[in-house]
Amino acid sequence: MAGHSKWANIQHKKARQDAKRGKIFTRLIKEITVAARMGGGDPGANPRLRLALEKAAENNMPKDNVQRAIDKGTGNLEGVEYIELRYEGYGIGGAALMVDCLTDNKTRTVADVRHAFTKNGGNLGTDGCVAFNFVHQGYLVFEPGVDEDALMEAALEAGAEDVVTNDDGSIEVITAPNDWAGVKSALEAAGYKSVDGDVTMRAQNETELSGDDAVKMQKLIDALEDLDDVQDVYTSAVLNLD
């Protein structure tokens, strides 16, 4: 199965993540706390917590910080009670956006999200207005040059749902959300280390944007991601920023 070119977008995403690394710990602490509250403190029995801990390890979060977040979630330590919110809307060229938040103040959050949309050429929609276009799945991306047949065999044996070769030669392994961490670990044990990966809401129909439209869309995404209550921003936009 063939896919679009992902390589440039991955590199661009990594550059933006590095620039925002100061906020990553705060978001991870929130996610670990909520994951532990919802599913318990054992990552072996809690896929959401296991994913959050994988991200914490990748970002070199101190173990004491991680344990405190788990303890706050399980009630062993006092902590803030966060609620989960999802907002949907439209960006440049009608591109779909989904914005996941963890907050202790819903009124503040919706006002901030609406302002970011409005100020940057988008508009906040109603619940369900774009959700139909997204599917919840995990993915792992491997550099061009990896033995596709061997990787496919290892991935499918590990429980992956699909393996996609992108136009630029990179290879993408698709998983069910709860299987992502297990597939990643199995492939690493077999000698395959991914260069990107996550559990995401992926658009089934994409919107290609280039030139000024791509720049404006990136500005909208950045404005949303910069909000303290925002955890993740998903979009149908494919940005050609070169």
UniProtKB/Swiss-Prot annotation:
Localization per Swiss-Prot or TrEMBL: Cytoplasm
Gene3D superfamilies tied to this protein: 1.10.10.200, 3.30.70.980
Keyword Lipid biosynthesis applies: no
Record's GO cellular component terms: cytosol
Entry superkingdom: Bacteria
Transmembrane segments: none
An example Gene Ontology molecular-function term: DNA binding
Pfam families according to UniProt: TACO1_YebC_N, Transcrip_reg
Keyword terms of this UniProt record: Cytoplasm, DNA-binding, Transcription, Transcription regulation
Record's keyword annotation contains Magnesium: no
Swiss-Prot/TrEMBL GO biological process terms: regulation of DNA-templated transcription
HAMAP family: Transcrip_reg_TACO1
Family according to the record: Belongs to the TACO1 family.
NCBIfam families named in the record: PRK00110.1, PRK12378.1, YebC/PmpR family DNA-binding transcriptional regulator
Name this protein carries in UniProt: Probable transcriptional regulatory protein NMC1563
Highest classification ranks of the organism: Bacteria, Pseudomonadati, Pseudomonadota, Betaproteobacteria, Neisseriales
